[in-house]
Amino acid sequence: MSENHVPAWKRIALKRQTISSGDESKEKGQSNLIDDDPLNITTHLSTGNLTKKEKKRIINGESKSSTKKGKRVSKPGTKKKEKLSKDEKNSKKNKILKDQLRYLIEFFRTKSESKFPTGILELESVKENYGDSLIKDEPSESGVVEVWKFSKQKQNWLIKHFFNLDEIPSVYNDLLLLYFRDLQGKSKEELISKCKGKLKQWNDYVEDQETKIKALIAEDKASEPINGEEKEEGEKDGNAEQGKQKEVQDEQEEVQMPNKELVQRSLKLLEIWKNDDSEQIELKNFFVDV
């Protein structure tokens, strides 16, 4: 016999063993399919310990293999914005035109026959948004007439910031005064009262300065030398009087000078409304800048 010869009885035994192991693996595979079958709820319920994921998988009809999550691909981080320098920030800020100021410009553009003030045309924000289209001598290329629409919200903003030069620079005075020329009602009364208050602040400041100047002149006269025997005694009296005046001056509340541009804006608006019955206030030592 050759070494590779297998007896018949051994071949029969091996064949039976192979068939048996094949049946077992087949049964095991079927068992796994049954376990993975999402409709086989009885199998899961028999355990009594279902997790939330398993319950969700059963409801959605998913198998275990389909619930495996793929690896998340991390998104590249967004680049940090580069910080602008102070000059760059100011340059960017100067090119921004507020909606309320655009509202004023459109009002002047449609309601006035006059040219825009040179100061308006030279603003960076106006150049950036309008270019050369605000020059009255140049006809519109498109031939389209701009229609201005009234906005109560924007008007309230203009009234609120009438005395704020940061929000409404003095270069907008002509546009602002034209807009408020026909203002009526309670808003007009409140604005008149505030403008008069600004003029009164100026007069109070001027009076305070005049009082202090007179006091300084009196001090200078008191400190002048006196002839003869009364010189020494006069110096003592003068120094005493000077000390008293200084104490009184220190005790007086310092009157701050109001912003002259706001005083001028208030004065011009009151002059527009001077035909009303409201009492006019005369400014002391005030010269209007042209």
UniProtKB/Swiss-Prot annotation:
What InterPro entries does the entry give? WKF
Q: Where is this region: Disordered?
A: 17-91, 220-259
Where are stretches of biased composition, namely Polar residues?
A: 40-50
Q: Where is the composition biased (Basic residues)?
A: 66-83
Q: Biased composition, Basic and acidic residues: where in the chain?
A: 233-249
**Which BP terms in the Gene Ontology apply to this protein?**
maturation of LSU-rRNA; ribosomal large subunit biogenesis
Q: Which GO terms describe its molecular function?
A: RNA binding
Q: Miscellaneous notes for this chain?
A: Present with 1850 molecules/cell in log phase SD medium.
Protein name (record): Uncharacterized protein YCR016W
Give the source species: Saccharomyces cerevisiae (strain ATCC 204508 / S288c)
- Species lineage: Eukaryota, Fungi, Dikarya, Ascomycota, Saccharomycotina
